[in-house]
């Protein structure tokens, strides 16, 4: 059987970091994942997926990723159940993350936070990353105006040189 999940989305809130009685770190958060299609009104909808992550990964996530952070998650789907105060059985399905990766630079995250706050939209505000002298001007420019092979000479390859 295969139970493997790969998700890319944005955190809808800061992760809630807690510790079990045996001192195991566990963090929970919700990831907003856009659907690949548009609805009848031409708008993209999103699924809000509950994520649980354990141990050192949980502590790292709580320290580095904040509301609005674009994350890549790998893990598995798990369903658990419990009995609520009314005596009813409640089923909860969530993704147990094995790994996560932040998919944008700190400068991008800070820029989003600033632009959303300036525009009056606080959807992704609250990133507590310190800039400490970093600025957008220090971001390398990866655009190329010329061919990286422009100064090289063409190779002479005959049919006899090819192994097939």
Curated annotation (Swiss-Prot):
It comes from the Bacteria. Residues 111-138 have a biased composition (Low complexity). One of its GO terms (cellular component) is nucleoid. A motif (Important for interaction with partner proteins) lies at residues 159-164. Plays an important role in DNA replication, recombination and repair. Binds to ssDNA and to an array of partner proteins to recruit them to their sites of action during DNA metabolism. GO terms for biological process: DNA recombination; DNA repair; DNA replication. The lineage of its organism: Bacteria, Bacillati, Bacillota, Bacilli, Lactobacillales. This is Single-stranded DNA-binding protein. Keywords: DNA damage, DNA recombination, DNA repair, DNA replication, DNA-binding. Residues 111-164 are annotated as: Disordered. Homotetramer. Pfam families: SSB. One of its GO terms (molecular function) is single-stranded DNA binding. Residues 1-104 form the SSB domain. InterPro entries: NA-bd_OB-fold (IPR012340), Primosome_PriB/ssb (IPR000424), ssDNA-bd (IPR011344). PANTHER family: SINGLE-STRANDED DNA-BINDING PROTEIN.
